[in-house]
Regions:
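Basic phosphate/pyrophosphate-binding loop/patch that engages nucleotide-derived ligands
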Residues: 2, 6-7, 218-227
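Short, well-ordered beta-to-alpha junction loops that form the rim of enzyme active sites
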Residues: 14-17, 70, 107, 307
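Radical SAM [4Fe-4S] cluster-binding motif and immediate context
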Residues: 29-198, 203-205, 211, 215-218
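Radical SAM enzyme core and accessory elements
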Residues: 243-248, 253-354
Length: 354
């Protein structure tokens, strides 16, 4: 905790002791918050599946990705809640707020097979008719065919993987403990179980060369062939407090200002400063676009029926994938602009006539 003393000096208390028993913590005091204003607008960290509540099942992450600040904030001690208590909380939200979806916003929501199956069984036993999304990404090691089937039966619909790179050298440099063949096997199991799958990719790591970038490009194309539904390709922007951020700031390659905090939230490479020693922001933006066009072009060429399904869902006002969400948002913006122009023209003619 940081605060100012009576003389106006900044005082920090240092790291607090970790709370080990997460089940002893009270639920968020949503009654003190205008939560219905968000539920009515279908605010969600994932796709629009109706009235969505955010929920945490754990704290921390046992991994140490170099671009993430979790090791510094939470350490690598991973603590999680009893799955039955998590389901109890979901049931209360269903009764109290009539929710239809839950977003598990954990740093690492699904880590062990036993926990996932216990959670699924509890959801099924309670008969809760809510969908579950994992918009923040999760590990693939414990998600096999059996686990994927349990998750789908329990209402899990959107599953996000976070390989970040298709280059073994890059994965080693960023301390990303992921085996790409294992991730692809997990992805296949999730697809066969009926889950809508998404993956996040990062390009533009300062140490990334052309060969590593091409390896990631080929991996993204392989995911398209494997049947991945959607992909997000983002430009490297390390979290403040992370290993990469602190190193680059010491080297003077990151300017610690408001623009960095703002631009790091944007998906467009053109809105960010390039940290890469060779590739400019505009070049990274072009690479980002090339990755996305290649993935979706190949994915829909391989499975053309999916594109028709996306179109039908968008026209029907339903969302099941990130692509549905993207196109629905763009359609709403276009329609809003058209209606604004029409109304502006009508008002202008009315004023002229008056």
């Amino acid at each position: 905790v940081a605060h100012r003393d009576e003389q106006g000096r900044v005082v920090t208390t240092g790291p607090g002791e970790r709370i080990a028993d997460l089940d002893a913590l009270p639920e968020p005091a949503w009654d003190l918050f205008p939560v219905d204003a968000y539920l009515d607008r279908h605010q969600s960290g994932g796709v629009d599946r109706g009235r969505s509540m955010p929920l945490l099942t754990s704290r921390g992450c046992p991994y140490k990705c170099s671009f993430c600040s979790s090791p510094q904030m939470w350490t690598t001690r991973y603590l999680r809640r009893d799955p039955a208590r998590v389901v109890d909380e979901i049931a209360r939200y269903v009764e109290r707020y009539s929710i239809s979806n839950v977003d598990l916003n954990d740093l690492t929501a699904m880590l062990t097979k036993d926990w996932m199956i216990d959670f699924s069984r509890a959801m099924i036993d309670r008969g809760l008719e809510v969908s579950v999304q994992l918009p923040s990404g999760t590990r693939s090691e414990a998600v096999d065919a059996e686990t994927a089937r349990w998750l789908h039966r329990a209402g899990v619909r959107n599953f996000c993987y976070a390989p970040e790179s298709g280059s073994a050298a890059t994965l080693e440099r960023i301390h990303k403990k992921v085996k790409l063949p294992r991730l692809r096997a997990s992805l296949q199991a999730a697809i066969e179980a009926g889950l809508t799958t998404h993956a996040s990719i990062i390009i533009g790591f300062p140490h990334e060369g052309t060969e590593e970038l091409l390896e990631t490009y080929r991996f993204v194309l392989q995911l398209a062939l494997d049947g991945l539904d959607t992909v997000a390709v983002m430009v490297f922007a390390p979290y403040p407090g992370s290993e990469e951020y602190d190193r680059l700031r010491e080297q003077g390659k990151i300017i610690h200002d408001e623009r960095y905090f703002y631009s790091s939230l944007l998906r467009s490479a053109g809105a960010t400063r390039s940290i890469h020693p060779r590739w400019s922001a505009s070049e990274l933006a072009a690479l980002q676009l090339a990755f996305l066009l290649s993935f979706y072009g190949l994915a829909y060429a391989r499975r053309p029926g999916r594109l028709a399904q996306v179109g039908r869902r968008v026209l029907a006002g339903r969302q099941e994938s990130v692509m549905d969400q993207f196109l629905s948002t763009k359609l709403a913006q276009i329609m809003g602009g058209v209606m604004g122009g029409v109304m502006g023209g009508v008002m202008g003619r009315t004023e002229a006539a008056g």
